[in-house]
Amino acid sequence: MRTFGRDAADDRRAAVRRSDPFRPYVSYDVILYGALRKKGFLQESRAYLIPGSFAVAGLNFTPMYNFSRFFRAGLSLDAQYDESANLKDHIANDYPLADELKFHRPPFKEQFAVGVSIRCEVVMPIFSINLGIGKNLIGRGDDTNSFYQVFALKADVARNVFLHVGYQLYKFRNPNNLMLGVGYRFNGR
């Protein structure tokens, strides 16, 4: 096909660029996220919804091996602070009514967790779908010492900057928290 202003040399250079072979490489994603959440728990066969909202903040560092233009996988170091974690173990009043729940603030070590997860990612031109499964290695209490699963969508906003929207489950069935954040990809190509 011929167009105005192009010659055969331009066509040959374009053909060479299209046929460049993909070379696998490692990229590094750093993600900072946060969200608000509600919390409920069961005690003596009765369900309680804790009044108010609680903050969740996290940081992920994920080296990813890029197997092809469309798939990458790696391990992620995941740190998360959850203000509502393990509250059921720190009830201040005896046999409270649902609107009168009072709590002692749990120690930081019961609300903070660090884990490692295996991640895989399907890469598309504008966004990527990220799936992961992991285990908290540092964390005390039922809410922070568990297996967790991550499903996230990464939408590119610049060459190496992306928005991160995800959800985390724990113990393969229980909803944990929303993950709204921003990320940066080092060594992205």
Task: Please tell me what each predicted stretch does.
Residues 28-32, 75-77, 116-120, 131, ...:
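Membrane-embedded beta-strand positions of outer-membrane beta-barrel proteins
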Residues 70-73, 124-130, 155-165, 188-189:
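Repeated loop/turn-to-beta-strand initiation elements of outer-membrane beta-barrel proteins
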Residues 62-64, 119-123, 154-156, 183-185:
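Transmembrane beta-barrel domains of outer membrane proteins
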Residues 1-10, 175-189:
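Outer-membrane beta-barrel "beta-signal"
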Residues 35-60:
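Surface-exposed strand-loop-strand hairpins of Gram-negative outer-membrane beta-barrel proteins
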Residues 24-26, 53-59, 110-114, 145-149, ...:
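Residues that define the transmembrane beta-barrel architecture of outer-membrane proteins
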Residues 41-50, 84-108:
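Flexible, solvent-exposed loop segments that connect beta-strands
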Residues 32-38, 79-83, 124-126, 133-139, ...:
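Transmembrane beta-strands of outer-membrane beta-barrel pores
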